[in-house]
Every structure is written in C-alpha cells, then in structure tokens.
A protein has these predicted regions:
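Extended low-complexity intrinsically disordered regions
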Residues: 1-36
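Mobile acidic interaction elements
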Residues: 2, 6, 57-64, 75
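Structural motif
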Residues: 11-15, 66-71, 109
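Generic structural signal for hydrophobic core residues of well-folded globular domains
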Residues: 26, 82-83, 121, 125
Length: 132
C-alpha cells in the first residue's frame, strides 16, 4: 500500500538509499507490457518513454505501465499503485501534492515526469467519465 511505501521512504538516510530502493522497485515491477506501447498510451512530458493504460473493472480503475528504464519504472509503479482500485471520481480527486512524499526525493525533471504520469492517468479516467 502507499502508506507502507511512505513509511519505507521516511526511514531512508540518504538520496542514494532512495535511488537504490526506487531502482529495485522498478526492476521488480512492470511486467513486460510492451503491447501497450501505442500512441494513445504514451505519456507526454516525461524525459524517458513511459506508457500507461487504464482498464476499468466494475467501476474501478487499474493501470498498467511500461518504461524501459528502471528508475522511471519505479516512479510509475508507485503512481499507478496509488491510483489502482479507485473510481473515476476518486482518480479525479488525486493531486500532485498527494505524492509530495515521493516527489521530494526527485529532481525537477523527474517531478515533471511524475506530474505528467498523474495527468495521463487522470485524463484516462476523465475521458471515460465524460463519455457516460
């Protein structure tokens, strides 16, 4: 859960410890979802290529992702984890500041990427919300 992740990060003593942990998260997540690497799933605003696809199951959203860099995979994994299992209205309520605990450890470019990932997820849910 996100609370467990927050508590893990809170205990880190250095930026290197955070980076190493995020790389490990990235390495262990993101099953090989190359099949989602199509234009409509591509996240604009990230310095590395990232694709996120949403699937709605019984009114709740679940997000899959693909990136070919471990660090980015770690970030997108955590962002998707924070949005998985939410309704479209709940996804719409998520703010960048909900991830301050993660963003505080990122460079400016990576923070922009985090915002772009979150915007992409929100747009997926919003598009569905306005289509009903």
């Amino acid at each position: 859960s996100l609370d467990k992740i927050k508590n893990t990060i809170k205990d880190f003593q250095s930026a290197k410890q955070f980076d190493d942990w995020l790389m490990a998260v990235g390495k262990s997540s993101g099953d090989n979802l190359r099949s989602i690497c199509v234009e409509e799933n591509h996240v604009r605003g990230c310095t590395t290529n990232v694709w996120i696809k949403g699937n709605k199951i019984k009114e709740k959203w679940y997000f899959g992702f693909y990136s070919n860099t471990m660090f980015t995979n770690g970030v997108v994994s955590i962002v998707c984890e924070g949005c998985n299992g939410l309704t479209a209205n709940q996804v719409a309520q998520i703010k960048y500041t909900d991830f301050d605990w993660l963003g505080g450890n990122l460079t400016l470019n990576k923070k922009k990427g985090l915002q772009a990932m979150l915007n992409h997820i929100k747009n997926i849910a919003k598009t569905w919300l306005y289509s009903i």
